[in-house]
């Protein structure tokens, strides 16, 4: 998700991702999706990890649009797509300013943060959280910005 620096209740951003859909007759295929989206929590969005500051939103969008979807490659999935997109952003000098795009760090922090939120009952309704907001971790500041 690419969103504004300062969020308001009705802020929107753009969601970029590789999505798997069933094929008529069996099997599935991957396709790229770009959607304007709310920044509010959804059932498909567990956590957000802020990895960089956008310098040129158009350039970020072009990189996302041009990150390939790899049909028929065993083991390839949306996580592999994110990894490749971040690697492309990392070597580009126009899209992002300050950023942390080292895949092993981003992946490990995201997994650990999601587990921490699960342990705190963020997703099962037992905790005391504002469920309208997605829990967010700022990797640049190394701190949680939305619980």
Predicted regions and their residues:
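Activation targets extended, charge/polar-rich intrinsically disordered C-terminal tails
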Residues: 65-147
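Non-catalytic ligand/cofactor/substrate-binding and regulatory segments of enzyme domains
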Residues: 1-76
């Amino acid at each position: 998700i690419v969103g504004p620096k300062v969020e308001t209740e009705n802020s929107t951003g753009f969601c970029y991702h590789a999505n798997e859909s069933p094929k008529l007759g069996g099997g599935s295929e991957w396709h790229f999706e770009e959607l304007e989206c709310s920044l509010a929590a959804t059932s498909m969005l567990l956590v957000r990890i802020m990895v960089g500051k956008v310098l040129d939103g158009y350039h970020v969008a072009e990189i996302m649009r041009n990150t390939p979807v790899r049909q028929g490659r065993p083991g390839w999935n949306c996580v592999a797509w994110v990894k490749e997109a971040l690697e492309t952003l990392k070597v580009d000098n126009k899209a992002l300013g300050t950023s942390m795009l080292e895949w092993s760090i981003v992946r490990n922090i995201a997994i650990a943060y999601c587990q921490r939120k699960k342990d705190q009952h963020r997703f099962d309704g037992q905790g005391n959280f504002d469920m309208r907001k997605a829990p967010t971790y700022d990797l640049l500041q190394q701190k949680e910005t939305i619980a």
